[in-house]
């Protein structure tokens, strides 16, 4: 086997590892506020608000104006390109607001999913062209981590070996390019919850996908201590008739991770995948109470599951902004507890927190 030339210096490795550990410090997770313009259209239309740049700015301001209470439960915020260069009402750049709280800034760098020819409707993710230059610029502008999402779906014939291999390689290329530019890559191979498959089938597919991802990361000489993983929890398909407990979901999820994710990885930041706010918190809590040894931090990287109640409270009205921000802080604190296995539940069976946030065939 030929010698592998060191891709990163000791200093570069230390910087990447330190950033990753800051993001997933105990009780901390990630706010995913990186919805594209198209995704924001869906969010805003739900509350009857027009999808303009100004309305998107006002909504992001609701989230980013949260006070210092979020410092103990939010370790990182993922921005969308547009948001990275927007300012609050006082002319302070959003990125400065987040950095001043001691929270790490991240950026979504993929350019969306595209069809993978020769498959049954499967996809790969585009955005590698010019990625190195974009990462260098984002690093200068204050971002220290990035996110790239690949999507796989479960059916009788999918995910195919081709889709698994292609997406694993794309994630590895992205991760390698990020690290060369001092940016911690969050690797996101999302297996969609669409379908009627049971828990066992999701666990099997999750194991196969994660095994392929870590093989690719190894092939591309990616420094695992300077990465984070953003996977789906192992859950049944949305149309599955069987209902599973949070404990069953936790056991299946932790088992799949233990079989595939090296202990060198500092943290696993779960996506919420259309679960309701409460469901996402209960499941994360159960995962952190799972009786199996867990060498990584197991925390959250939630979008809708941190924002749904805030969005509902805001409804595009300036007068509601403060109340909406409070709703966001409440969810952030709950998930900070769940990330430590300390969440006892709010007793809220109704309201926005219990609403399913599922969107079929979810594309950002």
From Swiss-Prot:
Q: What else is known?
A: In vertebrates, three forms of this ubiquitous glycolytic enzyme are found, aldolase A in muscle, aldolase B in liver and aldolase C in brain.
Q: Does the keyword Kinase apply?
A: no
GO CC annotations, alphabetized: cytosol
In short, the EC number is 4.1.2.13
Indicate where the modification Phosphotyrosine is found in the sequence.
Answer: 5
- What's this protein's name? Fructose-bisphosphate aldolase C
SUPFAM superfamilies recorded: Aldolase
Organism classification? Eukaryota, Metazoa, Chordata, Craniata, Vertebrata
Q: Which CDD domains match?
A: FBP_aldolase_I_a
A single GO molecular function term of this UniProt record? fructose-bisphosphate aldolase activity
Reactions mediated catalytically = beta-D-fructose 1,6-bisphosphate = D-glyceraldehyde 3-phosphate + dihydroxyacetone phosphate
Q: Which organism is it from?
A: Pan troglodytes (Chimpanzee)
Which EC class is this protein assigned? Answer: lyase
């Amino acid at each position: 086997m030929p010698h592998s030339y060191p891709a990163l210096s000791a200093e570069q490795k230390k910087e990447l590892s330190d950033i990753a550990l800051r993001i997933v410090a105990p009780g901390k997770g990630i706010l995913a506020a990186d919805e594209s313009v198209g995704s924001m259209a869906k969010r805003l239309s739900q509350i009857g608000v027009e999808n303009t740049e100004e309305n998107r700015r006002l909504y992001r301001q609701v989230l980013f104006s949260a006070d210092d209470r979020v410092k103990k439960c939010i370790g990182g915020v993922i921005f969308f390109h547009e948001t990275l260069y927007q300012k609050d009402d006082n002319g302070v750049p959003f990125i400065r607001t987040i950095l001043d709280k001691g929270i790490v800034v991240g950026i979504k760098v993929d350019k969306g999913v595209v069809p993978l020819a020769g498959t049954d409707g499967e996809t790969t993710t585009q955005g590698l062209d010019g990625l190195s230059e974009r990462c260098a610029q984002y690093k200068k502008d204050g971002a220290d981590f990035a996110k790239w999402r690949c999507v796989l779906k479960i059916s009788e014939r999918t995910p195919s070996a081709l889709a698994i291999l292609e997406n694993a390689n794309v994630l590895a290329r992205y991760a390698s390019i990020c690290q060369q530019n001092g940016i911690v890559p969050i690797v996101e191979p999302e297996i969609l919850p669409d379908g009627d498959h049971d828990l066992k089938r999701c666990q099997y597919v999750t194991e196969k996908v994660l095994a392929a991802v870590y093989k690719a990361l190894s092939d591309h000489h990616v420094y695992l201590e300077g990465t984070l993983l953003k996977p789906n929890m192992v859950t049944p398909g949305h149309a599955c008739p069987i209902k599973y407990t949070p404990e069953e979901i936790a056991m299946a999820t932790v088992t799949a991770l233990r079989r595939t994710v090296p202990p060198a990885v500092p943290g696993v930041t779960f996506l919420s995948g259309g679960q309701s706010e409460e469901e996402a918190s209960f499941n994360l809590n159960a995962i952190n109470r799972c009786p199996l040894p867990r060498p990584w931090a197991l925390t959250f990287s939630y979008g809708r599951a941190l924002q749904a109640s805030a969005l509902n409270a805001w409804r595009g009205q300036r007068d509601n902004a403060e109340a909406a921000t409070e709703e966001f802080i409440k969810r952030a604190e709950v998930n900070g507890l769940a990330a430590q296995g300390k969440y006892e539940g709010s007793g809220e069976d109704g309201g926005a927190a219990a609403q399913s946030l599922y969107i079929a065939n979810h594309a950002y």
